[in-house]
Amino acid sequence: MHSSRRWIISALAALAVALPAAGAQAQSKTVRLAKQFGISYLPLTIMEQKQLFEAHAKKLGLNLKTEWVVFTSGAPMNEAIISGNLDFASGGVGPLLTIWGKTRTNLGVKGVSALNSMPLYLNTINPNVKTIKDFTDKDRIALPAVKVSIQAITLQIAAEKAFGPGQHGKLDPLTASLGHPDGLAAMMSGKSEITGHFTSAPFMYQELDDKRVHRVLDSYEVLGGPHTFNVIWATTKFYDENPKVIEAFIAALDDAMKQIAANPAEAAAAWVKAENSKLSAAYIEKLIRLPENEWTMVPKKVMVYAEFMSRIGMLSPKPASWSDLFFPTIHKLPGS
């Protein structure tokens, strides 16, 4: 965990020194993008591995170079984009809504596109926990970022449904911030205080392969159906000053998603290679083919999160619709 943090900090420092601030020129020639761990970021992995962004930019007359950085959660990514050390961020709906609310009157950060619709599972190694009501002070639930990650907010929505109005934060004291790989390792060791892990693919499926683990919560059940897990966001300044870069990015993202749908086996192999994963390409392909996992630009149930966060005081003002949260690039899509 500590080594990955040092790498991320070092990478950011290097980018901050080496690269000019976003929007320094009308069309940025070097674009800095960030992603996180997990197969939910598969389209970005395909874009990076096959240099699709550069290829589509070239069609528009741009000689584009890309710099990719990996984060463990959306919170530090937001710090990077606010400080001008990042052009495209990607993460959960929660961090997007948080930075949208905080920057409305200055940087104007908005979503460029949704990245996928995928469920999140809260798994546990504690046989006594059947529902979230069964967690006690002896349990600890790992998730990417306490209170602000999409997992944390989904847990709050579930807690309010389970314990009643005003009780959305009842389980917050039991949560701990850990990146997905570290959360998995901590719970599966059986020697950690971590007995629960609210995570994403492939980690949640890996955990359930172990007979000691069972699922306590499925985010699709909490929200009443498929919902957006990850989104991509940028500042209004970058969006306005780099129209061709945005056009190339959307084209590359669409290209990557089509390649995933057309050839899941090839996409799986590319992800395993890029992540230097110990998981087999066949295992990842199986996850890609699950009907519950979809890579799409269409935002789904983003307003469910927005309305909840607004009601409990985490988001102000409340967006009137999902399109308020995203740039016009995807307004024609049937979002929610």
Mark where each language-model region is.
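Bacterial N-terminal signal peptides that target proteins for export
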Residues: M1-A11
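Bacterial N-terminal signal peptides
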Residues: S10-P20
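Signal peptide processing junction and immediate N-terminal pro/mature segment
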Residues: A21-A26
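Short, glycine-/small- and polar/acidic-enriched structural segments
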Residues: Q27-H168, D172-S177, K191, T195-A201, ...
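Solvent-exposed, polar/charged alpha-helical surfaces in well-ordered, non-transmembrane soluble domains
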Residues: A55, A75, E79, S83, ...
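Pocket-lining segment of extracytoplasmic ligand-binding domains
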Residues: P181-V272
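Secondary-structure end/capping motifs
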Residues: Y239-S316
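Conserved C-terminal helix/tail region of periplasmic/extracytoplasmic solute-binding proteins
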Residues: M309-S336
